[in-house]
């Protein structure tokens, strides 16, 4: 491909709306264009990367015994009603009606449709096990689409579904998919950690996520370098601490004027935040007030709280609601003289803490040296604290590491979560009708483009890994008016094509500095610079990844690059 004819136009200005490096660089390098919030066009170079990513995924899925098909984007309401998810999936589900008033959704995932397909086809145990997969566009009405391809409303996903006769067979399918995913991410050259995860809206018995480390991911991973434990931070259990042994001091009421935050209170009273009780009022289902109590040095993990409450329909109480329900202001909510209609949840972190600082439900006043048993009685203990660096590993007790990451893959052992309500049964060897045991396995294909850029970039631009780069080689002609250079560049370009290298020839009539800047920005793995060294019978080969440069004889240049490319793909 000649760059002068290729639909690749870089931007010189920094995209103002972009926060994540992948969002900024994909826009600036001319790989994507935004149509609307969370909706992006993939331009030719991005589409080339996408197709190479899909090829790697297909190869490993086919190798695992999975079979590719293509389901529909439009899913009828009736299928989703069978599982109850038409109502419970939430506002992320795009819903629409046709001209006859029949309701559909744009598939965010395809458990209902694939289960319906299999129940119409599979009758006997002889037809099982089977694993079916597709690479298909999905839609989710994200509340806050952000970071470009990281959190989009329209995206491409690989979703697979396994169907088995029993739990043992289902676990074999699950492990096969787990192994396939590990091979996929290894071949994509992505640094990915497999972590235990919550089953969430999909449901089921077991779940693992495959998370690529990046500062702009929406997931937090806690992992142990000692025993290898890894899990999404929202499911890491934090047990009750041991009861403190210090002597209980007399409770006192102290004046704390204009002190509104834990940090301010800690400084004012000269106490560590861990000695302060923090109280946060939530409104559940727009009617039920729930007061969550937690140690002052901890934060509430609202994903954990969602599981405790059994609903995601909750929010922080407004200033007006705090005043109406408790007669006080935020920052001064305490545990004394609470109305009977207030449900109180105690985070494990408060267990056994002595000489606490507790608000009075009275602005500008606190109690100090408040102690359990003597001054108050505990209520229901729950685990709603965010895990943090240094918390104990639930497996071995060693300090945990915590990093942000981007979920690229998610696998679920579903059991009969969908087959039972949808009556997807088969006749077993004993002649009895039984529900099919299912699993589902997703990979965010378009999101992988963002993850690759997140992990492979520098201050100059993208550094695509060779196996998925839009082009493996960029031949840069420094002077389009120099016939000798031009002839050498043309010869190298044709030779590269003949030898199967995915090559782009920068034949544009631009300055060398302009071409080098573009080459750095778009990030092709190798470049051959055709310049003044041609008179010595040489060209310069450069590696975008390492910055290495080699002066190579013109006749050997393409073979030299081809060898480098083959090494990268091993």
UniProtKB/Swiss-Prot annotation:
Alphabetical list of PANTHER family matching this protein: MITOCHONDRIAL RIBOSOME PROTEIN L39/PROLYL-TRNA LIGASE FAMILY MEMBER (PTHR42753), PROLINE--TRNA LIGASE (PTHR42753:SF2)
This protein's name: Proline--tRNA ligase
Protein family (similarity comment): Belongs to the class-II aminoacyl-tRNA synthetase family. ProS type 1 subfamily.
GO biological process, one term: prolyl-tRNA aminoacylation
Disulfide cysteine pairs (residue numbers): none
Pfam families, sorted: HGTP_anticodon, tRNA-synt_2b, tRNA_edit
Broad class of enzyme this protein falls into: ligase
Main location per the UniProt record: cytoplasm
The entry's keywords: Aminoacyl-tRNA synthetase, ATP-binding, Cytoplasm, Ligase, Nucleotide-binding, Protein biosynthesis
Gene3D superfamilies the UniProt entry points to: Anticodon-binding domain (3.40.50.800), Bira Bifunctional Protein, Domain 2 (3.30.930.10)
Annotated localization: Cytoplasm
Assembly with partners or alone: Homodimer.
CDD domains: ProRS-INS, ProRS_anticodon_short, ProRS_core_prok
Presence of the UniProt keyword ATP-binding in the record: yes
Originating species: Aquifex aeolicus (strain VF5)
Catalysed reactions listed for this entry: tRNA(Pro) + L-proline + ATP = L-prolyl-tRNA(Pro) + AMP + diphosphate
HAMAP family tied to this protein: Pro_tRNA_synth_type1
The keyword Ligase is assigned to this record: yes
GO cellular component: cytosol
């Amino acid at each position: 491909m000649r760059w002068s004819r290729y639909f690749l136009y870089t931007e010189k200005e920094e995209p103002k709306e972009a926060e994540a490096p992948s969002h900024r660089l994909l826009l600036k390098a001319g790989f994507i264009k935004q149509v609307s919030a969370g909706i992006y066009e993939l331009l030719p170079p991005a589409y080339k990367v996408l197709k190479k990513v899909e090829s790697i995924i297909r190869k490993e899925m086919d190798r695992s015994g999975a079979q590719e098909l293509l389901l529909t984007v439009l899913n009828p309401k009736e299928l989703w009603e069978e599982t109850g998810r038409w109502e419970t999936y939430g506002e992320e589900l795009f819903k629409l009606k046709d001209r006859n008033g029949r309701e559909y959704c744009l598939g965010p995932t395809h458990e209902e449709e694939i289960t319906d397909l299999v129940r119409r086809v599979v009758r006997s145990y002889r037809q099982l096990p089977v694993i079916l997969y597709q690479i298909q566009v999905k839609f989710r009405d994200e509340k806050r689409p952000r970071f470009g391809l990281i959190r989009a409303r329209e995206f491409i996903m690989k979703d697979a579904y396994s169907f088995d006769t029993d739990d043992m067979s289902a676990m074999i399918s699950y492990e096969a998919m787990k192994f396939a995913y590990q091979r996929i991410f290894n071949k994509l050259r992505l640094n990915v950690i497999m972590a235990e995860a919550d089953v969430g809206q999909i449901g089921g018995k077991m779940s693992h996520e495959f998370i690529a480390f990046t500062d702009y991911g929406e997931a937090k991973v806690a992992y142990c370098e000692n025993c290898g434990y890894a899990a999404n931070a929202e499911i890491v259990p934090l047990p009750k601490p041991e009861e403190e042994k210090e002597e209980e001091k007399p409770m006192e009421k102290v004046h704390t004027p204009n002190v509104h935050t834990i940090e301010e209170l800690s400084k004012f009273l000269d106490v560590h935040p861990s000695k302060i009780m923090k109280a946060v009022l939530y409104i559940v289902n727009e009617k039920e007030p729930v007061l969550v109590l937690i140690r002052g040095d901890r934060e509430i993990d609202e994903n954990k709280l969602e599981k405790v409450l059994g609903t995601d329909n909750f929010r922080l109480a407004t200033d007006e609601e705090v005043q109406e329900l408790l007669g006080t202001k935020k920052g001064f909510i305490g545990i004394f003289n609470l109305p009977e209609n207030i449900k109180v949840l105690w985070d494990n972190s408060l267990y056994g803490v002595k000489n606490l600082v507790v608000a009075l439900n009275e602005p500008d006043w606190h109690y100090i040296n408040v102690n359990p048993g003597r001054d108050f009685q505990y209520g229901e203990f729950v685990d709603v604290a965010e895990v943090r660096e240094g918390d104990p590993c639930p497996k071995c007790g060693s300090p945990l590491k915590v990093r942000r990451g981007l979920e690229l893959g998610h696998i679920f052992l579903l059991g009969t979560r969908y087959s039972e309500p949808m009556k997807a049964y088969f006749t077993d060897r004993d002649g009895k009708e039984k529900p099919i045991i299912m699993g589902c396995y997703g990979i965010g294909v378009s999101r992988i483009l963002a993850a690759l850029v997140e992990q492979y970039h520098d201050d100059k631009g993208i550094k695509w890994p060779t196996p998925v780069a839009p082009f493996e080689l960029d031949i840069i002609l420094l002077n389009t008016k120099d016939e000798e250079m031009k002839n050498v560049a043309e010869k190298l370009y044709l030779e590269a094509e003949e030898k199967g290298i995915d090559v782009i020839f920068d034949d544009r009539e631009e300055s060398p500095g302009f071409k080098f800047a573009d080459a750095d920005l778009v990030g092709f793995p190798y470049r051959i610079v055709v310049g003044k060294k041609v008179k010595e019978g040489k060209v310069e080969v450069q590696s975008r990844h390492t910055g290495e440069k080699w002066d190579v004889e013109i006749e050997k240049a393409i073979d030299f690059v081809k060898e480098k490319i083959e090494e990268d793909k091993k």
